[in-house]
Amino acid sequence: MFTKGGLGNLMKQAQQMQEKMAKVQEEIAKMEVTGEAGAGLVKVTINGAHNCRRVEVDPSLLKDDKDMLEDLAAAAFNDATRRISEVQKKKMSAISTGMQLPTGFNIPI
């Protein structure tokens, strides 16, 4: 159970956390990460909203099998998506560091 002062402190922390989350979400939306496949022969760059910004294909792949190129493009996109998700989790978990949250309370990411 929370005391009056404890509840007020928790509300203050929640407001601070909300402000930090908004700032971090704005930062993440502006970020870009690049995923790679085929040892860097295919690169896909996405932003924090998971929108594809650029696809780069090494010219040596253009004469190869179409199916392989498609697979590498998909793998590069998946790599980029995984990377931006890791950045999001890391930045969002940093927000709650130092907060005295109730046991079992998790911040949704």
Curated annotation (Swiss-Prot):
Signal sequence bounds: none
CC annotations in GO: bacterial nucleoid; cytosol
Gene Ontology MF terms in the entry: DNA binding
Pfam families: YbaB_DNA_bd
Keywords: Cytoplasm, DNA-binding
InterPro entries named among the record's database cross-references: YbaB-like_sf (IPR036894), YbaB/EbfC (IPR004401)
Record localization: Cytoplasm, Nucleoid
Function: Binds to DNA and alters its conformation. May be involved in regulation of gene expression, nucleoid organization and DNA protection.
Family in the record: Belongs to the YbaB/EbfC family.
Subunit-level organization: Homodimer.
Name of this chain's protein: Nucleoid-associated protein BUsg_467
Native species: Buchnera aphidicola subsp. Schizaphis graminum (strain Sg)
